[in-house]
């Protein structure tokens, strides 16, 4: 069984890997954020309801927030790719992408940075 799901407290979530590509972009371009995770849920249900939220922060202030409040979490290894367009009038500097994948019982959170340069 995947990740020894039977021996874990369920639901189980593990963040496997994240990345932003490219790390430096120009205003008007886009980035790809990849979140890979492993999940184990009870065999009584094919999935559990979850929530996936991404925030783009500049100098600590949220510039953009996206939320999928009906995200289905199933047992397995999963990859979520999010493409984000950076506005043409975006300020130059360091940005932080904050991602949160959560259920009622569990929460994964990730922070990755990227730069906008002219």
Please describe what each predicted stretch is:
Residues 69, 117-118:
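Repeat-unit-sized solenoid/scaffold elements
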Residues 2-84, 94-102, 107-108:
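Contiguous segments within soluble domain cores/interaction surfaces
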Residues 109-115:
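Edge beta-strands of extracellular beta-sandwich domains
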Residues 88-92:
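Surface-exposed, short loops/turns at beta-strand junctions within beta-sandwich domains
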């Amino acid at each position: 069984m995947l990740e020894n799901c039977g021996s874990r407290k369920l639901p189980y979530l593990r963040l496997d890997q994240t990345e932003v590509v490219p790390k430096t972009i120009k205003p008007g371009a886009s980035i790809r954020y990849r979140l890979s995770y492993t999940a184990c849920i009870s065999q009584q249900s094919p999935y559990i309801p979850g929530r996936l939220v991404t925030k783009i922060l500049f100098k600590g202030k949220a510039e953009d927030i996206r939320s999928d409040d009906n995200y289905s979490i199933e047992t397995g290894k999963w990859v979520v790719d999010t493409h984000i367009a950076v506005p043409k009038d975006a300020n130059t500097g360091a940005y932080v992408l904050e991602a949160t994948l959560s259920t009622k019982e569990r929460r994964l959170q990730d922070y990755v940075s990227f730069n906008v340069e002219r």
